[in-house]
């Protein structure tokens, strides 16, 4: 018998009709048969036969309906960020707070595979239930984000650097949403590389439009851009996990061998990096600061 999918992927009141071993038997509003494992109950809740309780209903991999009192972060009516657990040829598998992972199909991901999310990234999704009662993650569309973002109508955020995640990636630019709900567009001319879908990145705000959407940049301010020597040092710091055993008292020979520059050029370069708060200079070493790492995170 085909299962009624109206309740699947949503929070509903179900009646407890029995107990088999460690599994409660529940009845949906349309007569659906739903199972509840005791491991999915609230610790302080005791269920009584004949009473109704609130549950989230989801299908297992074979389409059989199960319930949980551990409410997920998203439902088929609610969008939120969900953590990517892994990717494979079928797509990205995400954690939505249920006993099982949920698949975002490969067809919904960027055509360029290097822009696919990686484990630890976060996708803005809701739940989708197909005709066979299988559950998938659905990426937020532009129209969805239009109805959920927090508009900004002043310049208070201009030149501020905030963290955001791309929910849509196109050649023309990157569309991002921050934890505070700010909607940000970064034109292709304001980036050196394209961020992954769902990647946490640092974006500098450069303006806003009449709709309250922010415009951003992954490029540093002109006066913060590195000269050739500074870029060499910065790139080596990134390559060696943020620290190098060199400072202004290192020998000219060692500096020349590693950086291919004179000691005078090296001292000027680390001085500029220090003034821009990109590095700290300590006894015997230089190290990237949090701001320095953020340049890497924002694709400098």
Swiss-Prot record:
This is Conserved virulence factor B. The keyword Metal-binding does not apply. Belongs to the CvfB family. Keywords: Virulence. It comes from the Bacteria. Contributes to the expression of virulence factors and to pathogenicity via both agr-dependent and agr-independent pathways. Involved in the production of hemolysin, DNase, protease and protein A. Contributes to virulence in silkworm-infection model and murine model of systemic infection. InterPro entries: CvfB_fam, CvfB_S1_2nd, CvfB_S1_3rd, CvfB_S1_st, CvfB_WH, NA-bd_OB-fold, WH-like_DNA-bd_sf.
């Amino acid at each position: 018998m085909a299962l009624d999918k109206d309740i699947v992927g949503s929070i509903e009141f179900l009646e407890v009709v029995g107990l088999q071993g460690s599994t409660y038997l529940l009845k949906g509003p349309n007569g659906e048969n739903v199972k509840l494992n005791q491991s999915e109950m609230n610790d302080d809740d005791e269920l009584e036969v004949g009473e109704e309780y609130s549950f989230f209903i989801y299908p297992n991999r074979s389409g059989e309906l199960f319930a949980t009192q551990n409410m997920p972060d998203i439902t088929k009516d609610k969008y939120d960020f969900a953590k990517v657990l892994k990717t494979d040829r079928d797509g990205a598998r995400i954690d939505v707070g249920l006993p099982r992972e949920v698949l975002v199909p490969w067809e919904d991901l960027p055509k360029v595979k290097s822009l696919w999310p990686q484990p630890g990234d976060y996708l803005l999704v809701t739940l989708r239930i197909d005709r066979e009662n299988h559950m998938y993650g659905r990426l937020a569309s532009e129209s969805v984000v239009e109805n959920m973002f927090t508009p900004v109508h002043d310049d208070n955020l201009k030149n501020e650097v905030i963290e955001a995640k791309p929910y849509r990636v196109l050649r023309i630019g990157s569309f991002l949403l921050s934890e505070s709900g700010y909607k940000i567009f970064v034109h292709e001319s304001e980036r050196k590389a394209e961020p992954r879908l769902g990647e946490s990145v640092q974006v500098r705000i450069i303006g806003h439009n009449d709709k309250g959407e922010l415009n951003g940049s992954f490029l540093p301010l002109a006066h913060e851009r590195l000269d050739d020597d500074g870029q060499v040092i910065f790139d080596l710091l990134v390559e060696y996990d943020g620290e190098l055993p060199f400072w202004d008292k290192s020998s000219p020979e060692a500096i020349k061998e590693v950086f291919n520059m004179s000691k005078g050029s090296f001292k000027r370069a680390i001085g500029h990096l220090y003034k821009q708060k990109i590095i700290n200079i300590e006894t015997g070493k230089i190290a990237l600061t949090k701001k320095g790492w953020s340049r890497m995170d924002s694709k400098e």
